[in-house]
Design a protein with these regions (language model features):
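Structural motif corresponding to alpha-helix initiation and N-cap regions
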Residues: 6, 51-52
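Beta-strand-connecting loop/turn residues
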Residues: 41-43, 62, 141
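Short, structured patches in soluble enzyme cores that scaffold and shape functional sites
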Residues: 25, 68-70, 139-142
Length: 150
């Protein structure tokens, strides 16, 4: 295994929209899949959720990790890890960031998967049945990455 350069880590983050979010809840680490968008201009990860233990946990302890991988095979993969702080967004900035999230993910899908998507539910499983979506970002403090190639 070798370390990824900063530009390679950013490429992994830019070229994907599915990752894993790690946070602490009641003293235990939790890791869940998320749909995200990497905003290189703000150096943030943008996502959204609904009320529940994940958002409660991040409100209490804003230290989180996001992990993203590109796996070709067991012997050929890249993994990027982001350590940062959770920040809940509100009002116009939340609307702006959610728009960036939607358009950014749609662009990645068009480029990588060569298909058109029109609605958020085509690429994100979060339902609005539990109220208004909570838009958040992870301010990136530290990044790391690994690669394995044979």
């Amino acid at each position: 295994m070798t370390d990824l350069t900063t530009s390679a880590i950013e490429r992994v983050l830019r070229n994907n929209y599915l990752g894993h979010l790690a946070y602490l809840w009641q003293g235990k680490p939790h890791v869940i899949p998320i749909t995200y968008y990497f905003d290189p201009a703000d150096n943030t990860i943008i996502s959204y959720t609904s009320e529940g233990h994940k958002i409660d946990a991040m409100r209490k302890n804003n230290s989180v990790t996001v992990q993203v991988e590109e796996i070709q095979s067991m012997f050929n993969w890249e993994s990027a890890m982001v350590h940062g702080t959770f920040e809940e967004l509100e009002g116009d900035i939340a609307k702006q960031k959610l728009h960036s999230f939607i358009e950014g993910v749609k662009s990645i899908i068009r480029r990588k998967e060569r298909r058109e998507v029109e609605f958020i539910n085509e690429f994100s499983s979060k339902l609005y049945s539990r109220g208004i979506p909570i838009v958040y970002q992870v301010k990136i403090l530290e990044i790391a990455g690994k690669r394995r190639e044979t």
